């Protein structure tokens, strides 16, 4: 199956409405990942089909969970997941990509320029040391244990905001170790077309 058709079929299976222009931009992002990966080791994946599934479709499962937000922070963004695919599809949301690895933030800056993402800002630094970002939703994909994620980022969450942590298997143990002042709003299993692995999103808020 041609890559454009694979992406289109995956998006349709997920029930998402994403324009042709945005889909083309998502594939251009995959091209940038492949190009820069040779030097910067952004992802262990080399196969384009797997990149479409793991980096595009997997990231796009976040979209229904950021409806109505104006600002989002992607912590430990790495090669830009889920932040860049979200930014491509939601140009109305101001998104900050944060990572401590300067090679990765150099790639992110270049990707933002080449993809024309006016709604994205890249910040290089450790999350605990960042103080000039405040977001309606703070998200991460495979960044840290839930308790660490919320404690390290609580100062970056706006009042009334929430965390959206993208996880693999149901994180029962991690949920049990959350601090008392954090409320579990929802844990939802995610279906990613073409991905033979468990995925969950955990929505958390301050009590």
From Swiss-Prot:
A single GO molecular function term of this UniProt record: rRNA (guanine-N7-)-methyltransferase activity
Catalytic activity: guanosine(527) in 16S rRNA + S-adenosyl-L-methionine = N(7)-methylguanosine(527) in 16S rRNA + S-adenosyl-L-homocysteine
Residues that, per the record, bind S-adenosyl-L-methionine: 76, 81, 127-128, 141
Bilayer-spanning residue ranges: none
Protein localization: Cytoplasm
CDD domains the UniProt entry points to: AdoMet_MTases
Swiss-Prot/TrEMBL keywords: Cytoplasm, Methyltransferase, rRNA processing, S-adenosyl-L-methionine, Transferase
One GO location term (cellular component): cytosol
InterPro entries noted in UniProt: rRNA_ssu_MeTfrase_G, SAM-dependent_MTases_sf
E.C. no: 2.1.1.170
Family label: Belongs to the methyltransferase superfamily. RNA methyltransferase RsmG family.
PANTHER family: S-ADENOSYL-L-METHIONINE-DEPENDENT METHYLTRANSFERASES SUPERFAMILY PROTEIN (PTHR31760:SF0)
Function as written in the Swiss-Prot or TrEMBL entry: Specifically methylates the N7 position of guanine in position 527 of 16S rRNA.
Record protein name field: Ribosomal RNA small subunit methyltransferase G
Species per Swiss-Prot/TrEMBL record: Neisseria meningitidis serogroup A / serotype 4A (strain DSM 15465 / Z2491)
């Amino acid at each position: 199956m041609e890559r454009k058709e694979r992406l289109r079929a995956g998006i349709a299976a997920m029930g998402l409405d994403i324009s042709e222009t945005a889909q083309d931009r998502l594939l251009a992002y995959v091209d940038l990942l492949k190009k820069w990966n040779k030097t910067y080791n952004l992802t262990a994946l080399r196969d384009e089909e797997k990149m479409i599934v793991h980096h595009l479709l997997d990231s796009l499962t976040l979209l229904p969970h950021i409806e109505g937000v104006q600002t989002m922070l992607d912590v430990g963004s790495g090669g830009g997941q889920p932040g860049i695919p979200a930014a491509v599809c939601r140009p109305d949301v101001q998104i900050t990509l944060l990572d401590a690895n300067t090679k990765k933030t150099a790639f992110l800056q270049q990707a933002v320029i080449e993809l024309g993402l006016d709604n994205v800002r890249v910040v290089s630094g450790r999350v605990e040391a960042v103080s000039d970002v405040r977001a309606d939703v703070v998200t991460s994909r495979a960044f840290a244990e839930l308790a660490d994620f919320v404690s390290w980022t609580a100062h970056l969450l706006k009042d009334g905001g929430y965390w959206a942590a993208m996880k693999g298997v149901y994180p029962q143990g991690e949920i049990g170790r959350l601090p008392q002042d954090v409320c579990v709003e929802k844990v939802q299993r995610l279906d990613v077309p073409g991905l033979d692995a468990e995925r969950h999103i955990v929505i958390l808020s301050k009590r």
